[in-house]
């Protein structure tokens, strides 16, 4: 997968994505990351990329010229189809489903904003406007790095165990079940017996039920449009009954 990032702070993005699993994926050429400082395309004598908004108002806006010309360079190097993602608090909220959709693409471009916002004409370059959530941060770099991490994990070969991406929270539509490792007991806290009895049918059933229970307790909104199996419907009734009796 080819990923371009247009940013005023390229070192921040490069350093943030050069670590751990994503860094190894870049080293193995599974992810081709290129970060461009769009300040390099500024044509005014002060090398600035922002200006005051027409009509007045607080803050400064990113001017279209540097970003348009940075995109011209991206398109010249790779003229094929690409998804161009604008990091914007007003965009659609990023989630696992969006990550899975973007992971199917061959080429992604992230435009990281700064200052008060963008000249509206910049939006004509983009295919998607995406936000991390209902809050505002100083720039788009952190959001881009989070999204790139989530997307890259879904690229074949990036994770050592492909099943990890399948069983992660949200990949199944539910939160992940509790997990345990050695020792079997620590400070009076014991690993559930079912996980140590070797019966994989019972283990899988326990995991499925605990995943449903954790989702009901922490993110019940995820169940609103979730198509429950007959077993899950039965477990959910039991979970609700247990909760009511507490």
From Swiss-Prot:
<dbReference type="InterPro" id="IPR016009">
    <property type="entry name" value="tRNA_MeTrfase_TRMD/TRM10"/>
</dbReference>
<keyword id="KW-0808">Transferase</keyword>
<feature type="binding site">
    <location>
        <begin position="132"/>
        <end position="137"/>
    </location>
    <ligand>
        <name>S-adenosyl-L-methionine</name>
    </ligand>
</feature>
<keyword id="KW-0963">Cytoplasm</keyword>
<comment type="function">
    <text>Specifically methylates guanosine-37 in various tRNAs.</text>
</comment>
<dbReference type="InterPro" id="IPR002649">
    <property type="entry name" value="tRNA_m1G_MeTrfase_TrmD"/>
</dbReference>
<dbReference type="Pfam" id="PF01746">
    <property type="entry name" value="tRNA_m1G_MT"/>
</dbReference>
<keyword id="KW-0489">Methyltransferase</keyword>
<dbReference type="InterPro" id="IPR029028">
    <property type="entry name" value="Alpha/beta_knot_MTases"/>
</dbReference>
<keyword id="KW-0949">S-adenosyl-L-methionine</keyword>
<dbReference type="GO" id="GO:0052906">
    <property type="term" value="F:tRNA (guanine(37)-N1)-methyltransferase activity"/>
</dbReference>
<protein>
    <recommendedName>
        <fullName>tRNA (guanine-N(1)-)-methyltransferase</fullName>
        <ecNumber>2.1.1.228</ecNumber>
    </recommendedName>
</protein>
<dbReference type="GO" id="GO:0002939">
    <property type="term" value="P:tRNA N1-guanine methylation"/>
</dbReference>
<dbReference type="InterPro" id="IPR023148">
    <property type="entry name" value="tRNA_m1G_MeTrfase_C_sf"/>
</dbReference>
<comment type="similarity">
    <text>Belongs to the RNA methyltransferase TrmD family.</text>
</comment>
<dbReference type="GO" id="GO:0005829">
    <property type="term" value="C:cytosol"/>
</dbReference>
<dbReference type="InterPro" id="IPR029026">
    <property type="entry name" value="tRNA_m1G_MTases_N"/>
</dbReference>
<feature type="binding site">
    <location>
        <position position="113"/>
    </location>
    <ligand>
        <name>S-adenosyl-L-methionine</name>
    </ligand>
</feature>
<keyword id="KW-0819">tRNA processing</keyword>
<comment type="subunit">
    <text>Homodimer.</text>
</comment>
